[in-house]
Regions:
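Extended alpha-helical assembly domains of large eukaryotic scaffold proteins
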Residues: 1-168
C-alpha cells in the first residue's frame, strides 16, 4: 500500500503485478442488471515477472519494483529506465531505493567484511536529473524541472545549490 493509502499493489503466484486505486469510482452491475457506484478500481496497468515491490514512504505516486534482474522506479505507473540489480528491496525514501544483496550474503557469509557493503542504493531518475541540471544548466532551468517533478529532496538540492552560488 502506498504512503497515503490510496493505492495498493499485489503480486500473484505467477509474478503478475496488479494495482488497485481506492480513490477511483466506477460502476458495477448487480444481480438484477442495474448498476451501482463502487469505490475502488482494479487498474489496467500490469507488469509481468515481478518478484518484489516497495512503495515510496514519502511520495504516494512512486514505487520501485524488481522485474527479473532489473529495478524499475514507477512514477504514476510510468517506468523510468531500468537499472540492473540483484538486490532485495528494503527501503524507498527521498528518491533513493535501498536493496540488500541477500544472494551474496547467503553464498559466502564468511567473506563479508561489513554488512554495509551488501546494501546498494539507487537514485530515482528525477534525483539524478536534478543533480545533472544543477551542474550543467542554469539554476532557473533546474527550478523549472523541480516544479514539474516536485519532491522535498529535490527542493533541498535547489536550496543547497542556491546557497552555494549565493543566488537566493
Amino acid at each position: 500500500m502506498n504512503c497515503d493509502s490510496t493505492k495498493f499493489s499485489i503480486i500473484d503466484i505467477n509474478g503478475v503485478l496488479s494495482f488497485y486505486d481506492f480513490e477511483s469510482t466506477g460502476t458495477a452491475g448487480n444481480v438484477r442488471g442495474a448498476s451501482s457506484q463502487m469505490k475502488g478500481e482494479h487498474l489496467v496497468t500490469e507488469r509481468k515477472e515481478v518478484w518484489s515491490i516497495i512503495w515510496s514512504s514519502d511520495n504516494p505516486k512512486l514505487c520501485a519494483l524488481m522485474e527479473k534482474n532489473r529495478l524499475y522506479v514507477l512514477r504514476d505507473f510510468q517506468p523510468e529506465e531500468p537499472v540492473l540489480s540483484a538486490g532485495y528491496l528494503c527501503d524507498f525514501t527521498d528518491l533513493e531505493v535501498k536493496a540488500v544483496l541477500l544472494d551474496d550474503i547467503l553464498k559466502d557469509p564468511e567473506e563479508i567484511k561489513s554488512i554495509t557493503e551488501m546494501i546498494v542504493e539507487y537514485e530515482a531518475k528525477s534525483l539524478r536529473d536534478t543533480r545533472d541540471f544543477l551542474t550543467t544548466v542554469s539554476l532557473k532551468d533546474a527550478v523549472e524541472f523541480v516544479e514539474k517533478n516536485p519532491h522535498r529532496r529535490l527542493w533541498k538540492l535547489i536550496a543547497e545549490a542556491s546557497l552555494d552560488k549565493l543566488n537566493f
